[in-house]
């Protein structure tokens, strides 16, 4: 969900 250094998936 984030578009930073580490993209986290939306859960």
Curated annotation (Swiss-Prot):
GO terms for biological process: neuropeptide signaling pathway. Keywords: Amidation, Neuropeptide, Secreted. Expressed in abdominal perisympathetic organs and abdominal ganglia. GO terms for cellular component: extracellular region. It comes from the Eukaryota. InterPro entries: Periviscerokinin (IPR013231). This is Periviscerokinin-3. It comes from Aptera fusca (Cape Mountain cockroach). The lineage of its organism: Eukaryota, Metazoa, Ecdysozoa, Arthropoda, Hexapoda.
